[in-house]
């Protein structure tokens, strides 16, 4: 890649050097005068494509992209020799963002085609001479083509790396502590079954019961299991069983009086037992040949390391956009960890990190993700958790750690606490923006005295 970018730098530099300075000046003049119009027209046309609309529907994104597009047009069409290296780096950065968000390369290529199409009438309606118009157009199109090639090559490299990490995560997820995960999910669906059966037999209110897709097992399957076992037939079978039973469940909830009829009640109970039994059988088959493997896991805390953060965020953001369900993130910092570590030593510091990590595991659902983000910093991705649920989870974790007892080697008690920043997904497709605003909330929590939870709001 390094040799390729050097070659493209030489080519772009050659284009600029060989162009008549007057033509370059006129291309820059066109760019400055018409960048705003070109940007608006560009996004108007691109958004007609329903696939592109998926990535541009967020108002904040559209506003930021339009101004960024204006700057990009001016930079590329006004390039001087000394600008070329910086411009190549800009294309690389833009490509990384596209890959991180998951924008398909065909949309990027369509965008360049649209830009060249709308640039043509702008240049040829100017008051330049016919020869000047042709030369300005030639210089502008060649500049855009070089920028496009650099961006596409960088995008392909970034996207390929991301795809490789997606597959690595899938394999890691399959292998990581499989036996324990299997038993946990079997226990989860059995617990859901027992809860409903007891309520029916005791003639209790079923209103608080959840359909299978919204129970803990259903959330785990939709957010993790479906991805873990991607491409395996049993996944489709389980999906259909959940979907079919949800239909039966919802119909029953609309008229619970039918359960007073013994034959209908027995039929419903047998449908529950049959569905759960089939799902457990399929789950055992899926997990049968899976064994433990810890690549991608933080050795000390047994949490995910940040390697798989892009893979998970990309998938969960796509799910949230597709289904309209909430998504949130917590960024967590151990208060005064460096001071504790320096005072009591690394062994004590490691023990604190292990205890804190256990508190995370004990207070999140199996559909959530917990990462060790840095030394004493952690990220939790909460799937389908409302703002209130997000804050309750954060407060539960904070309270649990505050009550954790830890003694130093000399018997002295060590006080532990966490500062937590929370943020709700607002439609912006770049997960780094979600992390950024959660980090801003974390900063507020620290500034307001630590040992507290703060939710990011635009007014913060």
Swiss-Prot record:
GO terms for cellular component: plasma membrane. The lineage of its organism: Bacteria, Pseudomonadati, Pseudomonadota, Gammaproteobacteria, Enterobacterales. Its EC number is 2.7.7.65. Pfam families: DosC_2nd, GGDEF, Protoglobin. SUPFAM superfamilies: Globin-like, Nucleotide cyclase. It catalyses: 2 GTP = 3',3'-c-di-GMP + 2 diphosphate. Binds 1 heme group per subunit. Binds 1 Mg(2+) ion per subunit. GO terms for biological process: cell adhesion involved in single-species biofilm formation; negative regulation of bacterial-type flagellum-dependent cell motility. InterPro entries: Diguanylate_Cyclase, DosC_2nd, DosC_GS, GGDEF_dom, Globin-like_sf, Globin-sensor_dom, Globin/Proto, Nucleotide_cyclase. It is an enzyme of class 2 (transferase). SMART domains: GGDEF. Globin-coupled heme-based oxygen sensor protein displaying diguanylate cyclase (DGC) activity in response to oxygen availability. Thus, catalyzes the synthesis of cyclic diguanylate (c-di-GMP) via the condensation of 2 GTP molecules. Cyclic-di-GMP is a second messenger which controls cell surface-associated traits in bacteria. Its cofactor is heme; Mg(2+). The gene is dosC. The keyword rRNA-binding does not apply. One of its GO terms (molecular function) is GTP binding. The record marks 338 as: Transition state stabilizer. This is Diguanylate cyclase DosC. Mg(2+) binds at residues 333, 376. The keyword GTP-binding applies. It comes from Shigella boydii serotype 4 (strain Sb227).
């Amino acid at each position: 890649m390094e040799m390729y970018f050097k070659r493209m730098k030489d080519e772009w530099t050659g284009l600029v050097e060989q162009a008549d300075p007057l033509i370059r000046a006129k291309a820059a003049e066109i760019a400055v005068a018409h960048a705003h119009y070109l940007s608006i027209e560009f996004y108007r046309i691109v958004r007609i494509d329903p696939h592109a609309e998926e990535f541009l529907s967020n108002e904040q994104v559209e506003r930021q992209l339009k101004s960024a597009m204006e700057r990009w047009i001016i930079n590329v069409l006004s390039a001087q020799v000394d600008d070329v290296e910086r411009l190549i780096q800009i294309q690389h950065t833009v490509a990384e963002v596209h890959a991180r968000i998951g924008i398909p390369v065909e949309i990027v290529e369509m965008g360049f085609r649209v830009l060249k199409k709308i640039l043509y009438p702008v240049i040829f309606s100017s008051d330049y001479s016919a020869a000047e118009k042709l030369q300005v157009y030639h210089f502008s199109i060649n500049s855009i083509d070089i920028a496009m090639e650099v961006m596409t090559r960088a995008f392909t490299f970034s996207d390929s790396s991301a795809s490789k990490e997606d597959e690595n995560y899938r394999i890691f997820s399959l292998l990581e502590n499989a036996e324990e995960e299997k038993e946990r999910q079997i226990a989860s669906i059995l617990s859901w079954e027992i809860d409903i059966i007891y309520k029916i037999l005791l003639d209790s209110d079923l209103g608080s019961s959840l359909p299978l897709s919204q129970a803990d097992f259903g959330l785990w399957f939709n957010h993790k299991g479906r991805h873990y076992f991607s491409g395996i037939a049993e996944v489709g079978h389980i999906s259909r069983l959940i979907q079919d039973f949800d239909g039966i469940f919802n119909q029953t909830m609309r008229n619970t009086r039918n359960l007073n009829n013994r034959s209908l009640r027995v039929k419903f109970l047998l449908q529950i037992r049959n569905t759960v039994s089939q799902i457990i059988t399929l789950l055992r088959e899926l997990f049968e040949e899976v064994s433990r493997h810890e690549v991608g896991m933080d050795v000390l805390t047994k949490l995910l390391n940040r390697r798989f953060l892009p893979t998970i965020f990309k998938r969960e953001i796509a799910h949230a956009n597709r289904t309209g369900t909430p998504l949130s993130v917590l960024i967590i910092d151990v208060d005064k960890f460096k001071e504790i570590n320096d005072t009591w030593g690394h062994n004590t510091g490691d023990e604190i990190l292990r205890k804190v990590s256990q508190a995370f595991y004990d207070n999140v659902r199996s559909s959530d993700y917990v990462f060790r983000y840095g030394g004493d910093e952690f990220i939790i991705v909460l799937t389908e958790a409302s703002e209130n649920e997000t804050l309750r989870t954060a407060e539960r974790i904070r309270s649990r750690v505050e009550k954790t007892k830890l003694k130093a080697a000399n018997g002295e008690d060590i006080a532990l606490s966490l500062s937590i920043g929370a943020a709700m997904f607002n439609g912006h497709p770049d997960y780094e923006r979600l992390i950024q605003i959660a980090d801003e909330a974390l900063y507020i929590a620290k500034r307001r005295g630590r040992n507290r939870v703060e939710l990011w709001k635009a007014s913060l």
